[in-house]
Amino acid sequence: MAQNQSDTAKKDVVIKVRGLVNAFGSKVIHDHIDLDVYRGEVLGVVGGSGSGKSVLLRSVIGLIRPRQGTVEVFGQKTDEIEGPNMHRLEMRWGVLFQAGALFSSQTVAENIKVPLREYTAMGETLMDEIAAMKLNMVGLPPDTGDKYPAELSGGMIKRAGLARALALDPELLFLDEPTAGLDPISANQFDELIKRLQKALGLTVFLVTHDIDTLRATTDRIAVLVNKKIVIGTITELRKSDDPWIKDYFSGVRGRAALADMAEAH
């Protein structure tokens, strides 16, 4: 399902992936894949176990060097910049890793201030104010800032991690399995939070997930990693695919339920 040139020509490309090959030893994960992510959209990334969803995310943000191909973020090739230039680029995105990745020895507020300390010269008072503001933004009470990660529920850890990802007011947000491990109610609430923040802040979101309900609730388009390649479309478009995995995922019981929910919402 190729990207339609006439539909996309005027869109601002935030992430541009071309000819990407990722491999570990002789095992090829991604085989010459192309992907564009447009400003202001929520792109979901889904695929079976071992399809390399998180590997793709880490390739985009420069944590994994691809064997072949190029990755551009905001028009800059991530493998060609370093030092201060890379720092300036990193300040334009925020990342929420799957487990929250909070430092257990620091309070939630201190965790939120980590990127502020790393990338800015802000004073302590201003950092405290920003940490409090970000907690409020993700729906956590003020006293959460004084707690340690071990004192938080799974849903609160995800929200605290999101607050840290938003600390530098990024334009681009990477979310790696944001609802994994959450009960259905908490997952639904987190989906609603993502969509609300995306609209309010004008974010571009790159969202890795296995959850079709999250895809339905939050995404504009979906990139499916299958057979080392990538297929891109909406849920409705992907349901028409002849690929067995895609057909089963989007047209199975949960896929049909998600589509029914979409129809009711409209």
What are these regions (language model features)?
Residues V46-G48:
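The feature captures the beta-strand-to-loop junction immediately N-terminal to the Walker
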Residues I61:
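Helix-to-loop junction immediately C-terminal to a conserved catalytic motif
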Residues Y148-L152, M156:
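Conserved ABC ATPase signature
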Residues D169:
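Conserved catalytic motifs of ABC-family nucleotide-binding domains
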Residues L173-D176:
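Catalytic Walker B motif of ABC-type/P-loop ATPase nucleotide-binding domains
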